[in-house]
Regions:
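Non-catalytic interaction/Regulatory regions outside core domains
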Residues: 1-136
Length: 136
């Protein structure tokens, strides 16, 4: 891995780690446009509801849905985030550059407040990365 890729990977993993520290978060991961899990995973002690193969399929479906949403960017503006509420888990997807931050939380969590909190974490990380670049 070259230095730039290592820094991006480290920054994305740091973001996922910070999100996993939030209360009621089960999973935080960065998904590529092709549906591959780039970084992230489940919080320690959490048992996934689905097996590895089902999760890979799910990641791909989230990536495809995100790519289809781009068709409407000219009409509605850029996609920011979406929420899904299910019986066993709620899901938040946030578009970050060419990746999708996928977050699973326990049901009943205010997903809009969570999206705002995660956006502030993203902003803090970007500010930290920018300041680090200025020092280099």
């Amino acid at each position: 891995m070259n230095i730039l890729k290592e820094e991006i990977h480290s920054s994305m993993q740091g973001l996922c780690d910070n999100v996993l520290e939030l209360e009621n978060v089960r999973f935080a991961g960065m998904i590529s446009n092709f549906g591959n899990l780039y970084v992230g995973g489940f919080k320690d002690g959490i048992t996934p509801y689905e097996n590895d193969e089902a999760r890979r399929s799910m990641y791909m479906k989230f990536a495809l849905e995100s790519n289809f949403r781009k068709d409407f960017d000219d009409s509605f503006g850029a996609f920011k985030y979406s929420t899904i509420q299910r019986e066993k888990v709620s899901i938040l997807t946030i578009n970050i550059c060419n990746y999708l931050l996928l977050v699973f939380v326990e049901p009943g969590v205010d997903l809009h407040a969570l999206a705002d909190r995660i956006q502030s974490i993203i902003d803090e990380n970007e500010s930290h990365d920018h300041n680090k670049q200025n020092l280099d």
